[in-house]
Amino acid sequence: MNPFDESMMREALREAELALSAGELPVGCVIVKGGEIIARGHNERETTLDPTAHAEIVALRRAANRLNAWRLNGCALYVTL
């Protein structure tokens, strides 16, 4: 794994720690475009009572919102699971 990928996985692990501290299953995710994190997410199912609030889905929704597009061309997703 290259140093950039390692740093992005560390960021995803930080998100997983946030999930754990909120009583969630500790899964975290970051989405990157052009070397920059554009979205983060962690499991929020218990706190939101939303069965779709998995870390990846939360991050994907935030990325799409930020880019104002549903196609996330050129993006990479890093997830702890």
Predicted feature residues:
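Zn2+-dependent cytidine deaminase-like catalytic core
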Residues: 3-6, 10, 33, 39-81
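Short beta-strand scaffold segments in enzyme catalytic cores
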Residues: 27-35
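Short, basic/aromatic recognition patches
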Residues: 1-22
